[in-house]
Amino acid sequence: MNDNARLEPVPVDAHDGLLALFHAAPVVALGEAHWLDQQHRLIQELLFDERLAETVDAIVVEFGNALHQPLIDRYLAGDDVAPRQLRRVWSECVGGWFSRAFESPVYAEFFETVRSVRLARRSERPQVLLGDPPFDPLDGVGAVELALGQRDEHFARVVAREVLAHGHRALLVAGSGHLTRRSDVREGNVVQRLEREAPGCCTVVLPHYVFEDVVERRRSDIAKLERKLERWKPPAIAPIRDTWLGEVDATLYLSDTARLVEPDGTEIEIPTPLLDDAGRVLERVSLADVADAYLYLGPIDSLTLAEPPGRAVEEP
């Protein structure tokens, strides 16, 4: 990387910067580092910021089973919903069915905050749309496998039908791998599918977060990166293109391997190389290839995870 040939990124306050991104595109795709306290604190602060509801019509989230959209609509409108029923919205997501990925308290807190803000303002904004496929665990393992294969397709369809078709704006919140401009999904992830149908509709934001197994392998790369970021005041956001950030190796954030949790709880590691539009493995992918803006929440070592109760794992 030739740092001298690239401009210095210009960070701004993340609250202002995220909202400003909607001037460029109707959809802002915010890659979520699952369970990350600092990122969910920022999301909470945005929910309390009146400018968010004035700017966006909907928030589309990965951590919600679309089967329960009517239930969450009633809850957010102020109806009483039994806690056991409400919990099904995020705990029965097929994306976290075996791993319990969405049982961290940050997801329940998200819905609680949206409800309290809407009721306080007597407003129906922002709407919350559940992006994970409709799935009933009582239908058995076959239903799980079917829904797992439909996650990106379904999420993209919700955005296209409920947001773009009406000329609306939306904030998407999902794991970064679902929202980057390159992915390991041959048919395309959420953003790739949306951009095929409506080029330029998305702005992609990637958080400064590295999975623990990658940290162990690439400490020198992370140290070099963080020396360049040490003057940034978190939370901050900056455009990536034409800066030295754009030249950073994207696999630092999007690992070329993934851990899958089998139905019996066994974890297996599989290769997940990033692909080009023709499905060919890409040898080198930079940050500018996968995202448009960089969200800095503090040094990696200072970040904390809100793990699900009773669960201790290396990474979400």
Region spans (language model):
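Compositional signal for N-terminal targeting/processing segments
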Residues: 1-316
